Amino acid sequence: MSCGNVSKQSNDPQLGCPRCGVNGSMVVLFIPHRQRREFRAVNRDFASSLIQLNNTFYREHSASFSDTRQAPWPGWVRTMDIALEQLDVATIEHPVRVFDLACGNMRFENFAAGGALAAKGVDGANPSADASCPFEFYGVDSCQDLAIDARGHALRIPNLHFQELDVLDALMKLNPAETPDVLFDAPLADISVCFGFMHHVPSCEYRVRVLDALVRQTRPGGIIAISFWEFMNDERMARKAVRAEARAELTPPFEGYDSAQFEAGDHLIGWQNDRHAYRYCHHFDDQQITDLVRGVRTFYKSGEVPVRELERFHADGRSGELNRYVILKRL
């Protein structure tokens, strides 16, 4: 497992990661991102502070954030087309179970339920009008105020189950050797998704653990869809990150803040006109994503990757390339 930090000169996927120390040897770093940084391993305390920084942001800005996050993402259309094409829905004796890790304000659930019912000739803008929704939703998020927001998406979505859980806090409490089979209060899903969250997960170790938790929550034959934010390829977002990080050097966002602790791809982004609001975000490249998927195998005794990649594509934003989607099938 190399976590995206191994040398491009090597084609050996078994080379060790200098950050995680998995499978051995040190290699020359190659950071494809245009803003390269010297590699530094993120320590546990610093990672915890970054997580708390984001938790504080969403608690304090849940309303304004949700107001700007109402429209569905174009990438969701293709995601659901692929997922439903792969699943033999006719053989599923229960509503299709959809698990959403970091569900936010439930707009994906609103999109999925509304689109499915619209296809049946029912008003997609009011999905609760039909009790025969073909989906059963299980959403998990650390911020209930965001999930159950004032616009009432959650109240309009049929067959919705919500669990308030800070998955990163739960994973950080585990011994590194532990791999819990049960982390969520939900049955195994036919479709598991994680949109707009991976960029908030600090360090290679915890990104692999989050993906592993998503894989374990999916039944064999089920579909897993994840989005990875490539925000530093967008000039406007890159400028926002530069400004926020310069501000953080003058007014640190938390005690012990040290930008030298960042990994390549780690950034801070501000929010609207609040000079004290920060979000920790990680910019991904394709090699990191590939290594992340491969990294899940370290949790399985056979050493085999428990998923097969079906498709990878760009979507969203003005450029149509703001997010990188990866669609996996659970083996």
PLM segments and residue spans:
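Cys/His-coordinated zinc-binding microdomains
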Residues: 4, 21
